[in-house]
Amino acid sequence: GAGEGEIARFVASWLQRMGVEVVWDEPVPGRPSVVGIVRGSGGGRSLLLNAHMDTVGVTGMQRPHEPLIEGTRLYGRGAYDMKAGLAAIMLAAAEAKKMTLRGDVILTAVADEEYASIGTQSIIKRWRADAAIVTEPTALQLCVAHKGFLWFEIVTRGTAAHGSRPDLGRDAIVKMGHVLLGLERLNQELQARPPHYLLGHGSLHASLIQGGQELSSYPERCTLQVERRTIPGETPEQVEAEVRDLLEQLHAADATFEATVRTTLQRAPFEVVPDAEIVQTVRRHATLDDAPEIVGNAAWMDAALLTAAGIPTVVFGPGGAGAHAVVEWSDLQQLKKCSAVLVNTLREFCA
């Protein structure tokens, strides 16, 4: 798309007006992230606040970039995923500027979470913190785990020939049919394994398939894109081995079966223990009548990258609905509550 330049400039300008130190981080041209720093007096713990600025497409939406408020709901593309969470950390950073803290507050408004996460990946190379809060939408619940994923490309090989010459042709699409049946069996095996206590089971599905050139020819190539969703404890090596084993079994049963597999993208799952200090600190300040629930999320978030970098992380953000949907909205009351919880959390954690 157009990149994050315009929204990044807005975030940077707003933070500067609030007196927050701003660093511009642009590892890829046109995909900037903004870091806002409220420096403490020294000797305290630092807290990183993370939200992404990018959104998905707007096909089918009516006036997606014109904000509409009805009651406590703000409608528009990105309102839920995740401009509300971004607004919450901006407000919290502005409040932090008014406090006397020993530790630093580091706001990271990042690019590209929806695809390759180049924003957060660049941030963790340059910045460290004692804990982090990602304000993806959780309806003010505490998310301590989410799934990871791997994307595979499987290619089966055939022999091109005229459709009238079955003695010469070998059908790559038919060969891929055996792969699809094998993947279905593998997915059934995944459902029979012990589930994660918050996330359930891992899963896989065939996402895209392409093969053949014309009706009167045997296809020499068929390509399948597969997504495998992983749970904590499942490693990329284990997942890749399962797919390779399937292809080897198919070759053992049919010497004419030829296939290759490669991983095109992988992201680890995320998990933090519920009694981690950052989780419990947020929980204390988020407790009104009842303590917020400890939950998991099936989607992937940048929390996994922060945790892998050694930063204990929890996901806590305002509610709403419609991520990646035609109708998207965020709850403005929950946005205010989220920001207040962040302010009280950083006041304690960075004291």
Question: Language model features by range: what are they?
Answer:
Residues 50-51, 108-110, 133-136, 155-157, ...:
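Short beta-strand segments
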Residues 45-48, 72-73, 105-106, 130-133, ...:
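Structural motif
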Residues 54-70, 144-155, 281, 314:
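Acidic-glycine-rich active-site phosphate/pyrophosphate-binding loop
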